[in-house]
Regions:
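Short, surface-exposed charged micro-motifs
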Residues: 38-39, 133
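A short mixed-secondary-structure module that forms the rim of ligand-binding clefts
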Residues: 40-78
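Charged, gly/pro-rich active-site loop segments
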Residues: 2, 82-152
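A generic structural signal for short beta-strands and their flanking turns/coil linkers
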Residues: 19, 35, 43-45, 63-67, ...
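Short glycine/serine/proline-enriched coil/turn segments at secondary-structure junctions
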Residues: 29-31, 77-80
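N-terminal leader/targeting segments and the immediate start of mature chains
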Residues: 1-19
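A short, Trp-centered hydrophobic/proline-enriched beta-strand micro-motif
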Residues: 13-29, 67-71
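Charged, amphipathic alpha-helical segments
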Residues: 4-9, 54-57, 114-120
Length: 152
């Protein structure tokens, strides 16, 4: 697969296969912080994630909306282990118009259907005011394989 052939759905499939990813944000004191996250859904041609407006991660992404994400799942044949890494810009959609509000509600509902943890945390209520969704834009990165890493 060449770079020009990689689609948002290829990235989503890779993230689903990995399961848990690690996202780096810039903390308010300008230091990086890495935490586990999980990609949730593709809607409107975008990768969507979620967070809680009371968490530090939300404040960090509001102040500096640039992140890097990395994920991998070690295979039995370690040399065949694939991993994904990319940087992107975070967008919390403004819900000022009816169309965007409907999209955000659709995304939140899909996330709650996918994730038992999110369903439980927000009591299956897409209107919970602390439940925030965001998508990534300007994604740049790569799919890699441990067998092709050079220079280590």
């Amino acid at each position: 697969m060449t770079e020009s052939q990689i689609t948002i759905h290829d990235i989503a499939k890779s993230l689903d296969n990995v399961g848990l990813q690690y996202m780096a944000t810039i903390v308010l004191d300008s230091k990086p912080k890495v935490r586990p996250v999980q990609y949730m859904v593709v809607r409107d041609g975008k990768l969507w994630f979620c967070t809680n407006s009371q968490k530090a991660m939300y404040a960090e992404m509001q102040a500096s909306p640039f992140v890097e994400l990395c994920g991998s799942r070690l295979e039995e044949d370690e040399i065949a282990t694939n991993w994904i890494r990319f940087s992107a810009e975070v967008v919390f959609p403004d819900e000022i118009d009816e169309e965007t509000r409907a999209l955000v509600k659709e995304v939140k509902t899909a996330i709650m259907e996918k994730s038992a943890i999110v369903h439980e945390l927000y009591k299956n209520d897409p209107n919970n005011p602390i439940f925030k969704v965001f998508y990534l834009k300007n994604i740049q990165g790569s799919f890699c394989n441990l067998g092709h890493v050079k220079g280590l």
